[in-house]
């Protein structure tokens, strides 16, 4: 999708030394996937087909979200799923291509919207942790939505949220151990409470720098 933000990011990436640019407009013909494979990790992006682009159209925000490629990062027998703004339309397409597999960590689609992270999607991948990136204030969409959080809670998936926990770092070490660290204190039950129906003037601290980081640590030797 064309945007000024994407154009600026792409130009910045081109200026990085030794940076290989891989575009999802030219995926593998057999799998329609982008595979980046190194000796220590494997990253697979499941991209929409050209026919999907042609038939689906991009005339609404929902349709634009439905072309988000979903990626799975594999490292030391651990799997982390990255979903962008994926929703109920492209989640089934990815499930059909991966089959039923276990994934350890989910970056929840579309900031925890109720149109993403549906029951059949969660049951297909058996996640243990869920990471939600959402604003701490000025959140007019009330993300994450309660319906989404209820689905995660029903499966006892530990939820981490940038609005409650600040910066979140997910690390996988050389032995495959997962460690999640947060800028602010983590409260399991508090993170199951959504913003649906709450007034927009919340008593939360706005932090525009809140981010989620995924780190593989073998190269650092610990």
Model regions and ranges:
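Non-globular, low-confidence helical/coil segments that flank catalytic cores
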Residues: 1-222
């Amino acid at each position: 999708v064309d945007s000024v933000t994407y154009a600026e990011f792409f130009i910045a990436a081109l200026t990085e030394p030794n940076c290989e640019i891989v575009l999802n407009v030219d995926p593998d013909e057999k799998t329609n996937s982008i595979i980046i494979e190194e000796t220590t990790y494997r990253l697979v992006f499941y991209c929409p087909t050209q026919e999907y682009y042609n038939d689906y159209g991009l005339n609404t925000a929902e349709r634009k979200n439905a072309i988000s490629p979903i990626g799975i990062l594999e490292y030391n027998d651990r799997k982390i799923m990255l979903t962008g703004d994926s929703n109920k339309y492209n989640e089934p397409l990815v499930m059909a291509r991966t089959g039923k597999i276990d994934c350890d960590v989910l970056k929840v689609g579309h900031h925890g919207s109720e149109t993403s992270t549906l029951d059949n999607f969660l049951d297909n991948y058996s996640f243990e942790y869920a990471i939600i990136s959402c604003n701490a204030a000025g959140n007019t969409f009330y993300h994450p939505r309660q319906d989404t959080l209820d689905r995660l809670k029903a499966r006892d998936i530990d939820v981490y949220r940038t609005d409650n926990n600040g910066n979140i770092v997910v690390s996988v070490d050389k032995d495959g151990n997962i460690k999640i660290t947060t800028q602010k204190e983590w409260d399991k039950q508090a993170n199951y409470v959504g913003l649906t129906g709450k007034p927009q003037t919340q008593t939360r601290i706005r932090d525009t720098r809140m981010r989620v980081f995924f780190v593989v640590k073998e190269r650092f030797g610990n």
